[in-house]
Amino acid sequence: MARIVIVDYGMGNLASVRNALRAVGFEAAVSDDPAAVAGADGLVLPGVGAFGTGMQNLARRGLDQAVRQAAAAGRPVLGICLGMQLLLAEGDEGGPRPGLGLLEGRVARLPDGLPLPQIGWNLVEPQRDHPLFAGLPTPFWAYFDHAYAVEGEPPSTALALTDYGRTYPSVVGRGNLLGIQFHPEKSSRAGLRMLANWGRMVCDLISTRPST
């Protein structure tokens, strides 16, 4: 069975993510132990709150390096909401701050003129085929709760786009790294399907590892 770990850095709806994974057949442990995080078969980095505080909490517990270590080892890493933003190079919430630097991109506040944070359902437009989107319609609806998003021209890692005041990547990814700006655990069937797809990706990767 895949060892999926939900990273506990004091910012996230951990139980709801774990329950959603369980609903689609995958058990996950919640841990703030860097060794458990670095040694997981798959990592979920959830998060609700401010970019700077998130990075501080990760660093204080040694979890920033543990996530980087897991990513460098090719373990699947899934960032959700703030967790997705922390995977990127930089965020400007509370002033420019470096992120984990695992994916390109900078996080900036969404433009004024619409209610912020964006809370509720919005369309997600996949831009290319990806196993994460298997079985989903194009576009599909998902549940958002955020005031910051990737800014500028969509980077090469953009897998899906959403419009709210401006068009921004709502799903990003490269190799074993994936980030979702919305909350799949709150996004009904589409969100559960994405979590199931990601869980299968973790299991498929385990099955291809050489035996030791």
Curated annotation (Swiss-Prot):
UniProt keyword Hydrolase present: yes
Cytoplasm is among the record's keywords: yes
Pathway: Amino-acid biosynthesis; L-histidine biosynthesis; L-histidine from 5-phospho-alpha-D-ribose 1-diphosphate: step 5/9
Subunit structure: Heterodimer of HisH and HisF.
Free-text function comment from the UniProt entry: IGPS catalyzes the conversion of PRFAR and glutamine to IGP, AICAR and glutamate. The HisH subunit catalyzes the hydrolysis of glutamine to glutamate and ammonia as part of the synthesis of IGP and AICAR. The resulting ammonia molecule is channeled to the active site of HisF.
HAMAP family per record: HisH
UniProt protein name: Imidazole glycerol phosphate synthase subunit HisH
